[in-house]
Amino acid sequence: MAVEFRSMARRLTGAVMITCMMGAPLAQAQTAPTLDPLVIAEFGTPPDIPTGALSDSVQAAVKTTFIDSVTGGRWGRDQSVGLIEIAESGDPRLVWLISDLMRFASSPQLHNALSAAASELLGKPFQTGNNWGDVTDHLLAWDVPAPPDYLTAKRAIFTEIIQGWDRIFVEGDIDWRLVSWGGVLIDDRPFDTTDEPCNCIPAADNPEVTSAEEATWLDDDDVVFGVEVNGEYRAYPRQIMEVREMVNDTLGGRDLGIPYCTLCGAAQAYFTDDVPAGVERPILRTSGLLSRSNKVMYDLNTYSVFDTFLGHAVTGPLAEKGVKLKQATVITSEWGAWKAAHPETTVLKERYALGRDPDFRNGRDANGPIFPVGDVDPRLSVHEDVIGIVTGTGTPVAFQRSAAVAALTRGEDVTFEDVRLELDAAGVKAVGPNGADIGSHQAFWFAWSQFHPGTALWPQQ
């Protein structure tokens, strides 16, 4: 593998031979991660992982290879030499930086050189055609630690290549290993100017709505995400949400931020008016980043990053204030059933779909997740729909949607601890002991189980 890697480096630089002297490595303990046998069966045995600081020469190679290459806008002989030193360091932690640069590498030669370096360090060939995804899946599944001072180099890569992320890549309660580029730019347009075009996933602020009778453009079998607040109902058509992915709205006298992660199959509704004193209403936007295939949202006012799936701020001023957004229930239904159950509903106007109807679920995602997710809890298939909720005791539980609908249709009770499921407009919601809304939503199994590892599952598998 080392010969193959050096050969690639020579082709990149045009040199006949590249040699480099490695500095003496620091004394480092070698540890092999302890993993579930199912992970090893799928991904193989992980390499030994060193601990401790990088040697001076490897630190210099990291700077040359990953920082200077993007700040200088070129890949030359020095970078190829640095990549060889990194590949020969025996430190798989450095593959996280290789993965980060691979995500942006448009040159097949550079991509192949980075892939060869990853193969050298991980002890596995990567020849899938999506080597970045395959490499990253292994890093995730094996839970390979990040190298020392990881954020500094990662920040340089991401902020030099994509403008607008300088205030995003900061220290916080976030595992930066999991964050990758989603292929789009940040949506940083000012609040209530979301009709302006952008090279981003365009949020919709204060969207115009119509009555159900006026929404003749919707077919009865079109999927909608239904929300009720203080007796007011609104439908957010999936074909709009697949284009917008974020809505800042007001319903029932409450301010809401509604992200939809197409990759996770999860539409969620967060109350953005219930925040600590002195905190301005968060205006939620799409960053263009992903965390293990879940969209990364942030607050436009403070650039505080949120864990989109869990609703708490993980960086910035809002994280310092401990902001965690409460959820309203989102019911995944069909337009015909929703308007029949709630004829007074309003619905977003057709123009917010921007003339598109991508139907990602039956197209792009038909063969599984398109971004790295690592190992997935094997109790259900990755794209199985579940209804997720955290009980009063703090226990996360996922209800298999198909099984729950069948049981409820037969008149059976579907319960777990203090949570009970109910049918609503051919969709499913979870309620508490007194029938109160407790903020449930639908998602793909792989997403729910990754953000709630060890989650309870109904019915038990």
Residue map of PLM features:
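Bacterial N-terminal signal peptides that target proteins for export
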Residues: 2-13
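Exposed boundary/loop context
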Residues: 7, 16-17, 296
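Mid-to-C-terminal functional-domain signal that highlights helix-capping/loop sites
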Residues: 32-52, 56-81, 92-461
